[in-house]
Every structure is written in structure tokens, then in C-alpha cells.
């Protein structure tokens, strides 16, 4: 697949392979085996660094202001970086799901009464629990039909709950945001950039009243 110069520029300043992956179409998402291999090494270790702090801070800020101390479902939690950012603010319950068993193995020691991690395919995951906050942190663009995924997860959202979506800025993200518009209304949105001028849009969303 040929990437346009503008998309290449978006990848500058951060690990190249890690930045190019989300720019591909969802159907080119690596299979489970590749994700397991990557989590077995240090491929995603940069996510815990300063270059990623801006969008994590916005996500945590929305949580702390809109649903402080609530229950959280983190879809595509990886190695639990977001959980470590949320924990100092407190939560009633946190569940992180990821289909890479290698990622979940790395956070086994963090499980406690309020914190759990589960190996699960987000497209088939189900629960009888309702969450105050559902977070898609750099995970939504990996799905073939992001809007269908969000619509499904709205069924797991508490009545006054909030969906928080963070996506690195790229041309093909516009279509995803537009596809979400009939399902959710924007409570607030923030765009942030790091020193390498890589940017993220983070939105706090609520289910539309008519749904």
C-alpha cells in the first residue's frame, strides 16, 4: 500500500513502524499472532513515554471531570498504560480488554478488587455490566466498521455514561468521526500535539437522546 507524503509526515518524530500501522486500512490489521509477537518485545513501550503524555492527559481529564470515581471499560487496553494513569484518580471498577494475551500477561499483578484485565476480542466481547465510561484509546481505527463497534458498546454504557475516543490525526480519521455523528453527540473535544508535531483528537461523547 502506498502512503501519501502527508501521511508519512504524520509519522515523523515517533517510532516509524508504530506510527505507520494505524495509517493502513482496517482490513490490513495484523493477525493475532503478530500482535502477540509485538507485545512479547518492546514494540509498544514508547506508549508510556513523554511523547504520548498529551492525549493520555486529556483522556484522564475528561474522566476526572465527567465521571469521577466511576466504572471504566478500556477497549484495547494493551499493557495497561491508561489504567496506570487513571488509578491515582480512583475508580469504582476498571476492566481492560485486549485480544493479545501477551499484553494481558504483563498486567496480571495489577488485578485487585477494583481492577481486572481480560483477554477478549472486542468485536465479540459481551457483558451484563454497565459502565460509566467506555474508552477507545487509539484502538477504534483498527476495526473494519468503527461505527458499528461504538454502536454495540453503547449497549454497555450507563444511562448518563461517556464514551471517550482518542485518535491520532490522519486524513482517514475524518470518515470515522463522521460515521460516529449519528450515534453520539460531542460533550467536548480537544486536539493536542507533542513536540514532534504529532497530533491527537480526543472527544468525550454521549449517546444521542433519540437512540
Predicted ranges, named:
Residues 2-42:
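N-terminal, positively charged/glycine-rich alpha-helical extensions of SAM-dependent methyltransferases
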Residues 43-58:
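Conserved SAM-binding loop and adjacent beta-strand
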Residues 69-78:
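Conserved class I S-adenosyl-L-methionine
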Residues 79-123:
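Class I SAM-dependent methyltransferase SAM/SAH-binding core
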Residues 126-134:
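A short acidic, Gly/Pro-enriched loop at the edge of an enzyme's catalytic core
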Residues 133-146:
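A short SAM/SAH-binding and catalytic strip from SAM-dependent methyltransferases
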Residues 149-159:
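A short glycine-rich, Lys/Arg-flanked "PGG" loop and its adjoining helix->strand segment in the class I
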Residues 160-168:
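Conserved beta-strand signature within the Rossmann-like core of class I S-adenosyl-L-methionine
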Amino acid at each position: 500500500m502506498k502512503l501519501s507524503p502527508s501521511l508519512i509526515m504524520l509519522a515523523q518524530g515517533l517510532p516509524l513502524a508504530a506510527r505507520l500501522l494505524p495509517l493502513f486500512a482496517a482490513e490490513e490489521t495484523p493477525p493475532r499472532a503478530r500482535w502477540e509477537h509485538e507485545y512479547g518485545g518492546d514494540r509498544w513501550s514508547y506508549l508510556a513515554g513523554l511523547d504520548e503524555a498529551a492525549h493520555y492527559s486529556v483522556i484522564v481529564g475528561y474522566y476526572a471531570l465527567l465521571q469521577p470515581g466511576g466504572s471504566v471499560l478500556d477497549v484495547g487496553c494493551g499493557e495497561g498504560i491508561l489504567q496506570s494513569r487513571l488509578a491515582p484518580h480512583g475508580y469504582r471498577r476498571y476492566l481492560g480488554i485486549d485480544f493479545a494475551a501477551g499484553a494481558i500477561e504483563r498486567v496480571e499483578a495489577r488485578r485487585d478488587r477494583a481492577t481486572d484485565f481480560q483477554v477478549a476480542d472486542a468485536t465479540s466481547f459481551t457483558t451484563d455490566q454497565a459502565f460509566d465510561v467506555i474508552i477507545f484509546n487509539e484502538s477504534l481505527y483498527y476495526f473494519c466498521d468503527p461505527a458499528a463497534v461504538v454502536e454495540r458498546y453503547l449497549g454497555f454504557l450507563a444511562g448518563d455514561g461517556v464514551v471517550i475516543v482518542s485518535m491520532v490525526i490522519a486524513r482517514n480519521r475524518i470518515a470515522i468521526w463522521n460515521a460516529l455523528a449519528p450515534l453520539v453527540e460531542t460533550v467536548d473535544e480537544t486536539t493536542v500535539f507533542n513536540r514532534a508535531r504529532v497530533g491527537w483528537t480526543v472527544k468525550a461523547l454521549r449517546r444521542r437522546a433519540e437512540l
